[in-house]
């Protein structure tokens, strides 16, 4: 019975987002196909990265409500002050699960919905960060994200690098050298995200954009 309830909630959320988005369906399906191919082609699995710190600022909470029903891996920082300040979660998704497939579509719709001008102007931010293809376990990937987010700079100390934020990621990659990109995306097959123009961007583990 629990699975039926969850599926109904997912379908309801999916319908709500479809009604609320003003965009042609061809654009969505193109984005969906690109991210699906990149995120799942290696092993049929990926991780959805969510920034839960923005939940309190967002007017539509159906995605966070649904995510509470899913297994997740929290990104645990070694710096105590960051534990509650930067709540990041990884949600494992599989192409073999219809339920996961529905969440995958919902996450794309939600990411596009977050790009609406009125939402950005009101400071709601972007909670859907990326779809990550990797051979790492959830715990291993969470540890890697935690270590990469905190960078030590000589004479300055530790700084918070929000590289996982889709509004930051696309600006950061061009200014990093090859070694820095590879370190940041170590053990990542592809890092997929939707940029500020609503375009799906696929980045390989070497930090280079994947050609369409």
Model-derived features with residue positions:
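Terminal low-complexity "docking" segments
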Residues: 1-162, 166-212
